[in-house]
């Protein structure tokens, strides 16, 4: 099946993507967050984000609209946040332009929630123990300076150069 007209010679080499075979089902895990009602922008205004340049879309597309929206997204100068450097990364302040570690951001701003979204850069060069160590160091540093901040760690997404792995799920 192709996505181009039959008279197009390139039609035979442009396949239509296969729909997802496995439906998304709720994860049964003690770590899974329960579904909640929409809390609106007041709730979102309390969330700070540490991550790579892909998070900047939250600001450029005006998804964050509160009085502190410019202070809610923190990205390293390089635009990349490899998981292996979570414990040493410094983030460019959208307010001062200074580069500061995550715990100082939280000490000054006291966010109710901190979402950590590392990039998968160089992830193949680290192992499970290293990842656990850098996350633990970062979380402990943040908690020491902002003990009431709730921390949400985003998972790293699987990366593949083709659709061979399209059926990867949390059940694997």
Where are these regions (language model features)?
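N-terminal, intrinsically disordered, polar/charged segments of Gram-positive cell-envelope systems
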Residues: 2-46
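A cross-domain feature marking catalytic cores of carbohydrate-active enzymes
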Residues: 118, 153-155
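Substrate-gating cap/lid alpha-helix
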Residues: 158-172
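Charged helix-capping and loop-helix junction motifs
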Residues: 128-138, 168-172
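Conserved SGNH/GDSL esterase-like catalytic core that processes O-acyl groups on lipids
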Residues: 41-130
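Surface-exposed amphipathic alpha-helices with a cationic face
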Residues: 139-143
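A short helix->loop->beta-strand "cap" motif at the edges of active sites that frequently abuts
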Residues: 146-150
């Amino acid at each position: 099946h192709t996505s181009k007209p039959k008279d197009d010679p390139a039609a035979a080499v442009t396949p239509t993507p296969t729909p997802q075979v496995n439906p998304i089902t709720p994860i049964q895990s003690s770590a899974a967050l329960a579904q909640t009602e929409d809390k609106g922008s007041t709730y979102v205004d309390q969330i700070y984000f540490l991550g790579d340049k892909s998070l900047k879309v939250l600001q450029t597309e005006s998804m964050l609209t509160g009085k502190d929206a410019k202070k809610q997204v923190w990205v390293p100068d390089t635009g990349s946040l490899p998981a292996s450097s979570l414990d040493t990364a410094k983030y460019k302040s959208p307010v001062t332009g200074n580069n500061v570690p995550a715990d100082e951001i939280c000490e000054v701003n006291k966010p109710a929630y901190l979402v950590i979204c590392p990039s998968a850069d160089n992830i193949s060069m680290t192992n499970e123990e290293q990842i656990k160590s850098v996350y633990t160091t970062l979380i402990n540093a943040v908690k020491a300076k902002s003990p009431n901040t709730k921390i949400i760690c985003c998972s790293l997404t699987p990366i593949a150069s083709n659709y061979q792995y399209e059926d990867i799920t949390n059940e694997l």
